[in-house]
């Protein structure tokens, strides 16, 4: 029964507005306390922003940079609140983490023109793993609010030759928009999308891990953006257009009659 309850709960969370995930998740846990651990580990939540007081830069909070009640900043590598024995990446991986944060900071600035990004890496037996986080919230200008949260978890298995690596990327994007205009009223639109991909890439000075991961993330975000734009927003536009027409009924009737006349004329021409 618990498996069925979990499936139903996850299916419900996928259909509810992303901007209300925390409240809805809390309500579900109150209803079925036994699902608490499974839900918290399975449901991606909107990213929260913290300030690194050491370097004066913002960073994003998630389970991957948390140890107990403290969170590690990717900029200073310090925990807040301070934690003496908190989990840390190896020296080699920390160097890669610093480079990755600088690279994705530029990526975020180019693609999103603002927002906050963070990259966290940790060691594995045969390689390493990491998470790339990006958050861009609308400022509410032009009566439009919204937020984009993307979470990219990548696992890197380094081959024994050291010249190639296997990359496994799992990406989740949570997006919501809200418009409030006097002519059309308030409209909410939001959802989340998760996609996976795996790929083998060459590792060299010309194509290091950061460049390979960057290309994978860029390609995945472009695909997700395209899917959201063409399928979700496109479908919503079709539905709205079907419900509400800018044409008068008389104009629409004339257009339909003209279309029927053209069809009949083409049929007669083909018969001749």
Curated annotation (Swiss-Prot):
Sites of N6-acetyllysine modification: 235
Residues the record lists as N-acetylserine modifications: 2
Cellular component terms (Gene Ontology): actin cytoskeleton; brush border; cortical cytoskeleton; cytoskeleton; cytosol; extracellular exosome; F-actin capping protein complex; hippocampal mossy fiber to CA3 synapse
GO molecular function: actin binding; cadherin binding
UniProt KW keywords: Acetylation, Actin capping, Actin-binding, Cytoplasm, Cytoskeleton, Phosphoprotein
Subcellular location: Cytoplasm, Cytoskeleton; Cytoplasm, Myofibril, Sarcomere
Family annotation (InterPro entries): CapZ_alpha/beta (IPR037282), CapZ_alpha/beta_2 (IPR042276), CAPZB (IPR001698), CAPZB_N (IPR043175), F-actin_capping_bsu_CS (IPR019771)
Protein name from the UniProt record: F-actin-capping protein subunit beta
Phylogenetic placement of the source organism: Eukaryota, Metazoa, Chordata, Craniata, Vertebrata
Gene giving rise to this polypeptide: CAPZB
């Amino acid at each position: 029964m618990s498996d069925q309850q979990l499936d139903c709960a996850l299916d419900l969370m996928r259909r509810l507005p992303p901007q209300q995930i925390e409240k809805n998740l809390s309500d579900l846990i109150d209803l079925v306390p036994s699902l608490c651990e499974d839900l918290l580990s399975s449901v991606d939540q909107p990213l929260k922003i913290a300030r690194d007081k050491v370097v004066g830069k913002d960073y994003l909070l998630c389970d991957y940079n948390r140890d107990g009640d403290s969170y590690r900043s990717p900029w200073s590598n310090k925990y807040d609140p301070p934690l003496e024995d908190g989990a840390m990446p190896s020296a080699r991986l920390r160097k890669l983490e610093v480079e990755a944060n600088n690279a994705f900071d530029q990526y975020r600035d180019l693609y999103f023109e603002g927002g906050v990004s963070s990259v966290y890496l940790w060691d594995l037996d045969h390689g390493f793993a990491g998470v790339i986080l990006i958050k861009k919230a609308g400022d509410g200008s032009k009566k439009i609010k919204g937020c984009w949260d993307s979470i990219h978890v990548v696992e890197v298995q380094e081959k024994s030759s050291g010249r190639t690596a296997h990359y496994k990327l799992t990406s989740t994007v949570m997006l919501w928009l809200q418009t409030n205009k006097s002519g059309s009223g308030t409209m909410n639109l939001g959802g989340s999308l998760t996609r996976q991909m795996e790929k083998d890439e060459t590792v060299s000075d010309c194509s290091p891990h950061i460049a390979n991961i960057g290309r994978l993330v860029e390609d995945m975000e472009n695909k997700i953006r395209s899917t959201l734009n063409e399928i979700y927003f496109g479908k919503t536009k079709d539905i709205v257009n079907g419900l509400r027409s800018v044409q008068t009924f008389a104009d629409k009737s004339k257009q339909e009659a003209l279309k029927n006349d053209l069809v009949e004329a083409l049929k007669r021409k083909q018969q001749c």
